[in-house]
Amino acid sequence: MEWKDTLNLPKTAFPMKGNLPNKEPEIIKKWEEIDLYKRLREERKGKEKYILHDGPPYANGNIHLGHALNKILKDILVKYESMKGKDAPFVPGWDCHGLPIEQQVEKLLKKEKKRKEDLSKSEFRKLCREYALKYVNIQREEFKRLGIIGNWEKPYLTMRPSYQAQEIRELGKIFRKGIAYRGKKPVYWCIYDKTAEAEAEVEYKEKKDPSIYVAFELVESPFDIKEKVYAVIWTTTPWTLPANLGIMVNPDFDYLFLRSEDKVYIVAKDLLESFSEKTGIEGEVIKEVKGRELEFLEYRHPFIDRVSKIYLSEFVELGTGTGLVHMAPGHGQEDYIIGQRYGVEAFAPVDDEGRFTDEAPEFIQGLRVFEANERIVEKLRENGVLLHHETVKHSYPHCWRCKNPVIFRATPQWFISMDGITEKGETLRGEALKEIERVKWIPHWGENRIKSMIENRPDWCISRQRSWGVPIAVFYCKRCGNIIDDEKVFEHIADLVEKDEFGADIWFEREAEELLPEGYRCPKCDGEEFKKEEDILDVWFDSGVSHASVLKSGFWDELKWPADMYLEGSDQHRGWFQSSLLEGVASYGRAPYDAVLTHGFILDEKGNKMSKSLGNVIPPEKIIKMYGADILRLWVVSEDYTEDIKIGMNLLKSIADDYRKIRNTFRYFLGNLYDFDANKDRVPYENLLEIDRWMLSKLQRLIDRSHSAYSNYRFHKIYHEIKRFVIVDLSAVYLDILKDRLYVYAPDSLERRSAQTVLYELLDSLTKLLAPILSFTTEEIWGYVREINPSVKESIHLEEMPVVNQDYIDPELEETYEKLMKVRDDILKALEEARRSDIIRHPYEAKVVLSLPDEYRSVVEKRIDWIKFFFTVSQVELSDQAEGDVIIGGEKVEGGKIAVKKASGEKCPRCWIYDESVGKDGQPVCDRCMEQLERMEIKISDIEEAK
């Protein structure tokens, strides 16, 4: 036997290296074997529910880091609420309809030398369904690999018949409330995908366009002006001029009549200088009027034989141009509003492909709108009304799918009216704004953001001219044109869809008469022949009804309505948050959520957006293969996710280093608890050593701060709090001090059991606090905890969070140890200086002599018998005058002095402490070690080194 064999050295099978890429799939397998999600539901049955409703990702392609960030954040929150003892089910979902899937299917058809037109709608929809299902299955496995716990066996899919049926019922409710209508209004239109687009589906990018100033000749010169008078407009969309049906001026602005040679130009007073700079036109101001005095003046179109009028509009601003705005109600939202006010139709001589129809002048018929710009500019030049022409770069809406510029185009569409009166006698807009005030928005600026959007948004265009989606289930009477929007008919169609294996396909396979209730007649003219609506619903309506199709459906008995939380990227203020809010308010008079939490976007290490063109995209799979999913989860909480969050290989390496430190701390716990039975060996609080009570007090503070951070969704605070606690408070101080006591004292001594009791508390609490974040590693640790305490649950995720034990909080003790820590910090500096001066090589070779102010001296003096272990030296002496080989002034302890000299006595071969009892009367070890060996019934004669 050797001296080291008499020590309680750490023992554990918990590996130093995580080997997460290989270990994590084994843990997922364990969760599946024990059916963890079902077990959670059983354990939490009857408890208060917490519902985080999953915003559905799009079933197209593999997941990217944005998906990972989103799902991990949701998982952290759901796991925390579950570990607080709540019933927190999570039903993941997928958005399965829409144009991107249609486009992918068309690409596949092209490879087979087929076209969409060669298939029936049902055949095409079948291919779309198969494509969506393929990616649902791919993404499901990718999300599970991230450690997300949820109802993966029964997710919600927007293409599932029961979901589609509820969507049709929701549409029926909106029609019953009288706020759905069909109208011809300008909407975003993609001329390449040939469909209307939602505001949330456009993205703004730089585009080059002509910038022109055009003179429109007034039919008669007003105010007794002799010369010809021209109203001057400025536009960057010359292609909209064929649809010009008016000019708008602001009633409150001042407008000037500027005489230049034999012509007079009308321009806003505040824009005269910039107008003259651009056009080179200068002259004499002969008249100044308010905008309202120009109302109803008539002018001639510059290249069409048409007379139109000047109208008043509050939308006209003085930022650029002339203060007179060309009005095309068929191509602009504000133009349309003013047109409606004055009874001017929405005219748009442009077809689905963006080509001018025969309603446009002959010289541009058949041309696409952007191609026509040049021809129109040339025509204006020929007619002598082009005052200035240049090319400008400006921000312009583009289709988020095909990346091409979109146009505003008036087409017959279905809308939900924002200003129609609901059952409560209020507008949908007004009700939605009230709900926004009731909902909790995190971060708080989200409230103003969505409020501003709702205040200013146009009516919601819910129709799309595509195949893969849920039909707008209305009919038209062939005899009188009456729209059949009877709620009973909606209910009948919903029932048919729900019972059919392929759901809404039935709409495209059957004739109108087969779909309507038997013997149905037009309530207006008694007609028997009907036509189906061909348009489908906007995908934002699809996902916007998820609260009803999922939470209210009863298909998932673990759920409830409304949701406690919606959590998505900040772009969803104009997307899913908004569509869900409007649908919820329209159908049920309230928002379907009580709180909304948003996260930012992912940037590379340099702060650039992730893009394939920059080559800075990192697939989650790459990170998982290299480091494991827990490192990705730790990255999610490493920064404030409510802002944009950076990622890169250097950052991940740094996070992996932090992970290793945390893991090694748990290894220390487990290694020193190998002979500890949590049910038998715990030391009662009142018998614990003082330093152990101090650490328990500090642990309670950490538990309290962690709960506060989780409850306020400040997950990065938890990471930094625990990281600091583990690295600074534990590894650098407490665990370092504890080694001597754990190794040297007899296994069942009070000194050792006291330390082990607190180690177990630390292990138990920290594992639970980290479980929502490091879901795999904490599960691995919990397997070893079960060996120490077989009464714990089978999975860490079935456990509940630690709660603060007020009895363990000791502010006075914390204050005492704050002082001792300051003394310790100064001692460590002095020891470092002594090491540099070759006085000592190891702290145990040192004796420290302390000269301290009274308040510090008294706390050390009370603990003089054992304080050397706290300072990790062999001897401590208090003196009025610190004398030694190295003397330093106190940095932390003002007025203090620390002297370091060689410790007296010999080095104990067992504990390495220098003590005068070593060698005395032939004793090979110090008195303390002799006592422990006797307790352990180990004879000196049995130790080889002692012979």
Swiss-Prot record:
Enzyme class: ligase
Cofactor(s) it depends on: Zn(2+)
GO MF terms held by the record: aminoacyl-tRNA deacylase activity; ATP binding; isoleucine-tRNA ligase activity; tRNA binding; zinc ion binding
Catalyzed chemical reaction(s): tRNA(Ile) + L-isoleucine + ATP = L-isoleucyl-tRNA(Ile) + AMP + diphosphate
Entry keyword Hydrolase: no
Subcellular location: Cytoplasm
Catalytic activity, EC: 6.1.1.5
Name of the featured protein: Isoleucine--tRNA ligase
Lineage of origin: Bacteria, Pseudomonadati, Aquificota, Aquificia, Aquificales
The encoding gene: ileS
